[in-house]
Structures are given as C-alpha cells and as structure tokens.
C-alpha cells in the first residue's frame, strides 16, 4: 500500500531493490513481477497481441519497419509514455552497453513549457496523428488522432511516442 500511495500521491516514482533475480527462472520472475504489479493496479496489455509483459531486448528487429517496437531493437529509446497510470521495470541483467532508464514527470514538463512557451504548451492539447504500428482493430484506420496532453483531475495526463507521430505521416490521409 505504501508503494501505491507514493506512486499516486507522492513523487510518482518508487525504486525497489533486493530481489535476487539470479535465484529464479524467468517464468517465476515474470509471475512475481506481474503479481506485484497487480497489487498496485490492474494489469493491461500494451499491444494488439495482448502481452501483459514486454521484454526490452534486442531481437534483431528492423528499426525502420513501422511494425517494430523500439524495445525490440538495439536503438536508444527516447522519452515516451505508456498508456497506463503506472509502469514497472525490472532489470534481469545489466546491458553490455546503454540500458540507462530515465523518467520525467508529465506535469513538470507541462508546467515548464507553459511558463517558457505557453503557445506551444497549448498546442499539446490539440489532436495529432499517431501511427497504430500495424496494430489497428478491424475496420479502423492505421492511425488515430489524440492530443499529447489531456487535462485530468490532478494535473495532466500524457500520451507521447515521437516515433509513432512521425511514422503516421506515411499515410496520405493523416493530417
């Protein structure tokens, strides 16, 4: 309950350590990680395949393929949001190179931008074309429009994935 409270009412970030991942097989670790996550909130998939757990590892996927997710490549991830209230990361082994994770508060970014460039901050509340990355439901367009920021009861919520915004431009009818 303390972790959940800190995520919702505190800084929005909690670092936990001490799980000896070398002691367990991958399936057991995955089960423990998902069980812990379910104590914080409802598990939800992040892709059309319904995966509740994604492995951030280079599987040799082509970064230029619109269906590729950046975490399947050896490319550096840029700042982005996942479409959930909370995200969990579990490190199973240290990367040979890179692998650094950084986090930033959407509220803090919005507040800073509103102070320094209010006209740009306002534009983030306007819908922008975003690529579905070949994961659209039947009968839906391969892109959708959504604002980067939306007002919420306690600030703003964000949905931002620059690669998806850029790749939406491959569709002639996307604004």
Label for each model-derived stretch:
Residues 27-34, 103-105:
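"Short basic amphipathic alpha-helical interaction patches in structured regions
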Residues 33-44:
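A short alpha->loop->secondary-structure connector
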């Amino acid at each position: 309950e303390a972790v959940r409270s800190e995520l919702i009412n505190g800084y929005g970030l909690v670092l936990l350590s001490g799980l000896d991942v070398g002691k367990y097989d991958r399936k057991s670790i995955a089960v423990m990680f998902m069980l812990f996550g379910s104590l914080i909130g409802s598990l939800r998939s992040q892709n059309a395949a319904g995966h509740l757990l994604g492995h951030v590892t280079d599987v040799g996927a082509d970064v230029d393929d619109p269906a590729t997710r950046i975490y399947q490549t050896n490319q550096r991830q840029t700042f982005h949001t996942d479409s959930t209230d909370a995200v969990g990361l579990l490190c199973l082994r240290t990367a040979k190179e890179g692998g650094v994770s950084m986090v930033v508060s959407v509220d803090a970014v919005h507040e800073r931008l509103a102070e320094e460039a209010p006209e740009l901050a306002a534009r983030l509340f306007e819908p922008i074309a975003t690529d579905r990355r070949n994961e659209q439901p039947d009968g839906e367009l391969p892109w959708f429009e959504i604002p980067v920021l939306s007002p919420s009861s306690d600030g703003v919520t964000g949905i931002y994935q620059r690669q998806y915004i850029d790749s939406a431009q491959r569709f002639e009818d996307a604004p």
